[in-house]
Amino acid sequence: MKFFKLISIVFIFISSVVFAHSGVKDENVKKRMMLMKTMADNTKIIGQMVKRKTPFDANEARLALERLSSLSLETPEVFIINASDPKSEAKLAIWDEFDEFTKLSMDLAETSSVLASSVETIDDLRPALKQISSGCKACHTKYRE
């Protein structure tokens, strides 16, 4: 039951990201939002496989995890500038606690990379999604409106 709740949270996040982008004027905020949307898209690939809405493909799952790792490494770079926009959901705490924000991002990058090398079967994917979702939640709880 907890797992399906976690999956629901991931899909709610993905939906909110899509609607949040309309009307954003600041280019730095747009870059951040696009990076987050791409992360959500890759998480969705994994979630769809776990929910068996799409067939399991080990290579595609590994690729999605590798992309999540790469995007996590890029995350601090797109947040260096404290840009604002009425559509931004970034809390000011990001810049007050940039080292902690960066650490959470690097932790997710490492987790995603390790998981990418270990996913062989659909049974490997469920715990992988749980770990990824926990990493996303750790950052969003603290740094996202």
Q: Which role fits each region the language model picked out?
A:
Residues S22, D26-E145:
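Sequence context surrounding c-type heme c attachment/ligation sites in exported
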Residues V10-F13:
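Short, linear, compositionally biased motifs with a strong N-terminal bias
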Residues S15-A20:
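N-terminal signal peptide c-region/cleavage motif recognized by signal peptidases
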Residues M1-I7:
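Bacterial N-terminal signal peptides that target proteins for export
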